[in-house]
Amino acid sequence: SNVGKPGDTDAQRQFIDAGIWRYHPTRKAFEIFARGLSNPWGFDFNDYGQGCATCCVIPHLFHVVQGGTYHKQARPHVNPYIYDDIKTIRDHTHLSAHGGARFYLADVFPAEYRDRLFMCNIHEHAVLTDVLEPKGSSFIGHHGDDFLPTNDLGWVGFSVCLLYTSDAADD
């Protein structure tokens, strides 16, 4: 696809066949953040500004840095001069089809959930967690617990949104 900000001509748009892009609504600026991946349906930043993406079909967890070129499902990369693409950081597998990604940064759940990456798994009908362990300049993603197994084939989680509210009456 040729992607750009609203109103751009085809000549102003950038080609992207897989990856993560972002648009700044007040500056009206479009940029490709990273290339590769396959259906990165979840992306979030942790407390330290490190981004992680969850993907569908291919290995599910990637530490994403701006400008990186990552493993993808099909076709050669747009840039023929890369030596190799950046691989997954996970050391385990879930069933395929992940959707959503959210680092838990609040303090309502027990302390062991802080900084975990929450994601939905469409085929498992569950909300799962991964625990990131620093390794060199990146991480290893370990399997956390299955936070919310639904045991309901009708429940297909796709997006993860964590809401924190405080009620002054509780104080």
Where are the predicted features?
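Beta-propeller blade termini and top-face loops
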Residues: S1-S166, D171
